[in-house]
Regions:
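Primarily membrane-embedded glycan-assembly and transfer machineries that use lipid-linked glycans
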Residues: 1-109, 133-169
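Membrane-interface alpha helices of multi-pass inner-membrane proteins
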Residues: 108-131
Length: 169
């Protein structure tokens, strides 16, 4: 796809247009770092609940292990590149991971993946997980949420949305 960011993404990040560039960068760096910390905490919690000890966990404790994991995540090439380009991929990854690891609630799985798909088209591939699981409610939630992001784009960006959906992709 030549352009994978739908109009909904522009709406979500519109507030950044009113901020000084350095403030926007600082917010993105803090958000990306928070996403790395949350990912690391999620990995730690998964290891705990599955009975798998992480290296150095005994010496570092919970906070130390999560801090080391966060550093490792942030040193990975894709994450470093995200800092350089100020991309939204950590936010998208956090939405997808949160959708699949959160406890079951009245809100079906798929909602957060649908929002992530509204920000960038590629996360929609995670709908295949719901399909393999035969989670029809989750698939319906994903599709409905994604369609809602498209509708919001058409309502609030009536010139740009048709251009994106009918020309850019």
């Amino acid at each position: 796809l030549p352009f994978t960011y739908p109009p909904f993404a522009a709406l979500v990040f519109l507030p950044f247009a009113f901020l000084p560039l350095e403030v926007g960068k600082a917010i993105m760096v803090l958000g990306t770092t928070a996403a790395a910390w949350w990912l690391s905490a999620t990995i730690y919690n998964y290891a705990q609940t599955s009975g798998r000890a992480l290296p150095l966990q005994g010496r570092l404790g919970r906070t130390g292990t999560i801090a080391v994991l966060t550093i490792v995540v942030m040193l990975c090439g894709p994450w470093r590149r995200t800092f350089h380009l100020m991309q939204i991929n950590p936010l998208i990854m956090a939405l997808i991971l949160a959708d699949f690891v959160r406890p079951a609630t009245r809100v079906p799985r798929g909602v957060l993946v649908g929002i992530a798909g509204g920000l960038k088209l590629t996360p929609l591939v995670f709908g295949l997980i719901l399909l393999v699981r035969r989670d029809w409610k989750g698939i319906a939630a994903l599709v409905a949420t994604f369609l809602a992001t498209i509708a919001i784009g058409f309502i609030l960006l009536p010139n740009e949305a048709p251009q994106f959906w009918f020309s850019a992709i």
